[in-house]
Amino acid sequence: MSYLFTSESVSEGHPDKVADQISDAILDYFIAYDTNSKVACETLVTSGQIILAGEVKSKVYLDIPEIVREVIEGIGYTKSEYHFESKSSGIISLIHEQSNDISRGIERESPLDQGAGDQGMMFGYATNETANYIPLSLDLSHQLMKELTNIRKYEPELMPYLRPDAKSQVTIRYHDNDIPKSIDTIVISTQHDEFDTAEVMQSKIMKDVRNILIPRIKANYSENIQALFDDKIKYYINPTGKFVIGGPHGDAGLTGRKIIVDTYGGRGAHGGGAFSGKDPSKVDRSAAYAARHIAKNLVAAGVSEEVLVQVSYAIGVTKPINIFVNTYGKSKVKLTDSQIAERVLEIFDLRPKAIENRLKLRNPIYKETAAYGHMGRLPKIVKKVFTPRYANVAKSKDLKKELKVELFTWEKLDYVKKIRKIFQ
């Protein structure tokens, strides 16, 4: 018996992702000018308004509204008819200083003895069904949204009616052995200009999605994945018939409401903690990245076809409470899952500061994670430029920061040889 599994993604213009990108852009600015900044930034976006709240401990004071407007403009909310626009939307910042009770519990004389920023359990997952070790349903969903955004931003003549907000959903039919058999359903809802009757608009968008978007997505995959794109796929494109009112004007957006889109599309597990707006002292983020790094390297090293890793922490405590490994009965080594977990601890230091150091997390690398998934991305070195506008940063001689940073370090397969040696 085959079975169906579904994952979804959203575009960078989706209200919740707008909020995530604002929170992570603010985090990046703080870390760019003070690498030891402690940040927890939450964002609410709605019609013509952005509200920020959270806690910060930092040596710098930044022009938060200017950073927010820069993000909104970059996404593409630049027209008054969107009722959410970069230049005219109101911004309220309620960010205040981090509690001394929290910082007292985290900071230590020796940096490596730094305690966890909160309690909680975090999960990492990997599967060998795609080249980037994430579920195919999720990868396709992300690629649909990324390519639709690329068309909107860089080739608007192809689909000139596109607006920033969009969602995708892909259902894969699997064989009993968990190998993808076919693509069953593709759902895309994309915001658009009002250019005709509802019926004509839906028909035009459906045609363009199938004739322009889908061939581009298909071309990016290997032959075995391309073979899954057959004429039996069910397409639901803007199934309500019309999607003109969207973005934060259509739905309020909040930081941290797309945690399954951010991770594994419903596969594996999730501890419940969101990522965006949190500096790496928050193990919600850093330990989830570390667990993904472990899981991906285990699968790439051939330990198992599929791996789930759980770690947990207590606030202020340096070492994790536990590590749990599940290979779903697909292990390729003659060890129990508990024995695999023991060997993982021999290889990976899971103290919070050790994770920060290993994955280079004390760098302004976070805005790029805030749309199209934190996992399954391509590690790369980029140059980022930060230009503050005022306050104590503006008194510095180094007004403009140009930094080379490495993105998505937790996606690197840099422990495969070490794992193979220990598990041989």
Swiss-Prot record:
GO MF, one annotated term: methionine adenosyltransferase activity
Binding-site positions, Mg(2+): D16
Binding residues for ATP: H14, D165, A166, K167, K242, F243, D251, R257, K258, A274, K278
SUPFAM superfamilies registered for this protein in UniProt: S-adenosylmethionine synthetase (SSF55973)
Reaction catalyzed: L-methionine + ATP + H2O = S-adenosyl-L-methionine + phosphate + diphosphate
InterPro entries tied to this protein: ADOMET_SYNTHASE_CS (IPR022631), S-AdoMet_synt_C (IPR022630), S-AdoMet_synt_central (IPR022629), S-AdoMet_synt_N (IPR022628), S-AdoMet_synthetase (IPR002133), S-AdoMet_synthetase_sfam (IPR022636)
GO CC annotation terms, alphabetical: cytoplasm
Cited Pfam families: S-AdoMet_synt_C, S-AdoMet_synt_M, S-AdoMet_synt_N
EC number from the UniProt entry: 2.5.1.6
Keywords linked to the UniProt accession: ATP-binding, Cytoplasm, Magnesium, Metal-binding, Nucleotide-binding, One-carbon metabolism, Potassium, Transferase
Sites where the protein binds L-methionine: E55, Q98, D251, K282
Protein's pathway: Amino-acid biosynthesis; S-adenosyl-L-methionine biosynthesis; S-adenosyl-L-methionine from L-methionine: step 1/1
Segments for region (Flexible loop): 98-108
Domain of life: Bacteria
Cofactor binding description: Binds 2 divalent ions per subunit.
NCBIfam families (alphabetical): metK (TIGR01034)
Function noted in UniProt: Catalyzes the formation of S-adenosylmethionine (AdoMet) from methionine and ATP. The overall synthetic reaction is composed of two sequential steps, AdoMet formation and the subsequent tripolyphosphate hydrolysis which occurs prior to release of AdoMet from the enzyme.
Entry similarity comment: Belongs to the AdoMet synthase family.
The name this protein goes by in its record: S-adenosylmethionine synthase
Source species of the chain: Azobacteroides pseudotrichonymphae genomovar. CFP2
UniProt lineage: Bacteria, Pseudomonadati, Bacteroidota, Bacteroidia, Bacteroidales
